[in-house]
């Protein structure tokens, strides 16, 4: 960690004497720069191109050195549009990698890849900054204990639990509740773990980024009245940005998260939406730099790039970074090198189902498709493991029987199968839950359900003790006691109607 100005601040004026080059060639977002002999910048150094365009407007473009070409030339990738740049323009070597603001000042704000605020809320305190390129924590610093990261969301904690300091892949199409699930996790980590979150929008649609920001303000995750009370920092590198920005915005978000973990000793949630866009941007940059493409046209350095990002996301003795990454699967081909490389790093997968969303069951997490390496008796305990397996068996049997029910009806099933179907429908509804961040829309107060309560509830349903209760009593409640109370209310209401 260092206390210094950011690369986008007054540092440039102090460094003008230091190391000056000039632009020799521009091909889209890639620049070749000539420096005096013996004054070559290092790989990953930030360069700043300064000058004026044809209309006399000030131009300032930050680039990152990617290759040393020989003959005092370097090749750099621009972090913003290169419109208006011409050959011969002055280039200043800042002498250091890109550095971005970190710490409490970043909460509630939106940044670009350079760590500059883009939300029109004024400047950010840049006294504490950190370089975006760092090595992963050493083995001796790592916390190797396998611990569950309790989210307070029943379906996640029971069937596909997250690992503290782990990486989770979030799979789901448009409109199945990915954003609401993300916001609920941000809210719950702040309340239950006293932690903060960092959201990295990598190659997002600008509209989606704006929608997320507005929804966060509406739900209180970002506190407009007192910005320091906010629970999240946002870093966006949108679809319209050059590939250099999209390739590095994930590292900017990760750097902010690392500060909260290492210095503030907090549990941090890091969201990356979408990890595929990070790979895609790397592929574009690789082609622009003239590297020979590898399988399916991807960059030959795909595994290395992915590893350098993913290995920094981990638990140390100070705190943890738990990462939730939205994964786009091109043409639904799971063997594509981009998702295949991502899978190697994931500890759990949360799959959102359009079928469940259509039934009105939220969160629409598919209980049978979602997986976790943590769901082992040696880690979660025999009780949790047994309950989760029995819940999955019941739901699987219900799924198998659905075709028969559709053709012949429930009456043709055996007594045992009818009981299984009834319990499975209760389980399906009990896996739904009212969210704190959705209170504004649903009108029902959000519920955080501890792991012990979750296990107790599902054990009661499986044991048959609650067979007499109507299935709608289990819909959108917190713990099992609320379901029994709701059943009594439903009974009273039906009597009054009669």
Curated annotation (Swiss-Prot):
- Write out the catalysed reaction: ATP + H2O + 4 H(+)(in) = ADP + phosphate + 5 H(+)(out)
Per UniProt, the keywords (alphabetical) are:
ATP synthesis, ATP-binding, CF(1), Chloroplast, Hydrogen ion transport, Ion transport, Membrane, Nucleotide-binding, Plastid, Thylakoid, Translocase, Transport
Q: What class of enzyme is it?
A: translocase
Pfam families reported in the protein's UniProt record: ATP-synt_ab (PF00006), ATP-synt_ab_N (PF02874), ATP-synt_VA_C (PF22919)
Give GO MF terms, alphabetically. ATP binding; ATP hydrolysis activity; proton-transporting ATP synthase activity, rotational mechanism
Matching InterPro entries, A to Z? AAA+_ATPase, ATP-synt_VA_C, ATP_synth_F1_bsu, ATPase_a/bsu_AS, ATPase_alpha/beta_chains, ATPase_F1/V1/A1_a/bsu_N, ATPase_F1/V1/A1_a/bsu_N_sf, ATPase_F1/V1/A1_a/bsu_nucl-bd
Q: Name one GO biological process term.
A: proton motive force-driven mitochondrial ATP synthesis
Nucleotide-binding as a keyword of this entry, yes or no, is yes
Report the subcellular localization: Plastid, Chloroplast thylakoid membrane
Taken from the UniProt entry, a GO cellular component term is:
chloroplast thylakoid membrane
Concerning CDD domains, the annotation shows: ATP-synt_F1_beta_C, ATP-synt_F1_beta_N, F1-ATPase_beta_CD
Q: What is its EC number?
A: 7.1.2.2
Topology in membrane? Peripheral membrane protein
Classify the main location: plastid
| Residues that hold ATP according to the record | 172-179
Quaternary structure and interacting proteins, as annotated: F-type ATPases have 2 components, CF(1) - the catalytic core - and CF(0) - the membrane proton channel. CF(1) has five subunits: alpha(3), beta(3), gamma(1), delta(1), epsilon(1). CF(0) has four main subunits: a(1), b(1), b'(1) and c(9-12).
Function statement: Produces ATP from ADP in the presence of a proton gradient across the membrane. The catalytic sites are hosted primarily by the beta subunits.
Q: Which family does it belong to?
A: Belongs to the ATPase alpha/beta chains family.
Q: State the name under which the record lists this protein.
A: ATP synthase subunit beta, chloroplastic
Lineage from the top down?
Answer: Eukaryota, Viridiplantae, Streptophyta, Embryophyta, Tracheophyta
> Source gene?
atpB
């Amino acid at each position: 960690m260092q206390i210094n100005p950011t690369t986008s601040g007054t540092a440039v004026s102090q460094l003008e004497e230091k190391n000056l080059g000039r632009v020799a060639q521009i091909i889209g977002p890639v620049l070749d720069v000539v420096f005096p002999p013996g004054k070559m910048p290092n790989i990953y150094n930030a360069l700043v191109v300064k000058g004026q365009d044809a209309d006399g407007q000030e131009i300032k473009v930050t680039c990152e050195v990617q290759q040393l070409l020989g003959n005092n030339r370097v090749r750099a990738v621009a972090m913003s549009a290169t419109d208006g740049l011409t050959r011969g323009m002055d280039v200043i070597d800042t002498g250091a990698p890109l550095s971005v603001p970190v710490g409490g000042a970043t909460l509630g704000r939106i940044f670009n890849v350079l760590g500059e605020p883009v939300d029109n809320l004024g400047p950010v305190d840049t006294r504490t900054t950190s370089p975006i390129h760092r090595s992963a924590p050493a083995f001796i610093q790592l916390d190797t204990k396998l611990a569950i990261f309790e989210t307070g969301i029943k379906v996640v904690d029971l069937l596909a639990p997250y690992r503290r300091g782990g990486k989770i892949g979030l799979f789901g199409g448009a409109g199945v509740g990915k954003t609401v699930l993300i916001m609920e996790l941000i809210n719950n980590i702040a309340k239950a773990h006293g932690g903060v979150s960092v959201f990295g929008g990598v190659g997002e649609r600008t509209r989606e980024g704006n929608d997320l920001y507005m929804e966060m303000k509406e739900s209180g995750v970002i506190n407009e009245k007192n910005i320091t009370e906010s629970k999240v920092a946002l870093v966006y590198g949108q679809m319209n940005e050059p590939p250099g920005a999209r390739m590095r915005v994930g590292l900017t978000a990760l750097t902010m998260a690392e500060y909260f973990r290492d210095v503030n000793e907090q549990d941090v949630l890091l969201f990356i939406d979408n990890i595929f866009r990070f790979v895609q941007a790397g592929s574009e940059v690789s082609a622009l730099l003239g590297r020979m493409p590898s399988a399916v046209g991807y960059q030959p350095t795909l595994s290395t790039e992915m590893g350098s990002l993913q290995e920094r996301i981990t638990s140390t003795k100070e705190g943890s970074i738990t990462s939730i990454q939205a994964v786009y699967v091109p043409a639904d081909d799971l063997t594509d090198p981009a998702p295949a490389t991502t899978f190697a790093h994931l500890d759990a997968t949360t799959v959102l189902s359009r079928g469940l969303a259509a039934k009105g069951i939220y969160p629409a997490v598919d209980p049978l498709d979602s997986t976790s390496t943590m769901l082992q008796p040696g880690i979660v305990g025999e009780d949790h493991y047994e309950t989760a397996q029995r819940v999955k068996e019941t739901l699987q049997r219900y799924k198998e029987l659905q075709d028969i029910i559709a053709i012949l009806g429930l009456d043709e099933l055996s007594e045992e199968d009818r009981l299984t179907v009834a319990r499975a429908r209760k389980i399906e509804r009990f896996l739904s839950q009212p969210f704190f961040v959705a209170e504004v829309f649903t009108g029902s107060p959000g519920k955080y359900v501890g792991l012990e309560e979750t296990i107790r509830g599902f054990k009661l349903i499986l044991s048959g003790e609650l067979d007499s209760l109507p299935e709608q009593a289990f819909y959108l409640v917190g713990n099992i006691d609320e379901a029994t109370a709701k059943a009594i209310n439903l009974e009273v209401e039906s009597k009054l109607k009669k």
